[in-house]
């Protein structure tokens, strides 16, 4: 997921900025 939000089990939603 690029420039989006990923939710992992037992984790809070975090934003990914792979597309710098």
Swiss-Prot record:
Top-level taxonomic group: Eukaryota
Family classification: Belongs to the peptidase S1 family.
MF annotations from Gene Ontology: serine-type peptidase activity
EC number: 3.4.21.32
Disulphides: none
Function: This enzyme is a serine protease capable of degrading the native triple helix of collagen.
Residues of the Peptidase S1 domain: 1-20
Region span, Disordered: 1-20
Name of the protein this chain belongs to: Collagenolytic protease 36 kDa
Catalyzed reactions: Hydrolysis of proteins, with broad specificity for peptide bonds. Native collagen is cleaved about 75% of the length of the molecule from the N-terminus. Low activity on small molecule substrates of both trypsin and chymotrypsin
GO biological process, one term: proteolysis
Keyword check for Hydrolase: yes
Keywords: Collagen degradation, Hydrolase, Protease, Serine protease
Keyword Protease: yes
């Amino acid at each position: 997921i690029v420039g989006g939000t990923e939710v992992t089990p037992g984790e809070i939603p975090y934003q990914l900025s792979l597309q710098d």
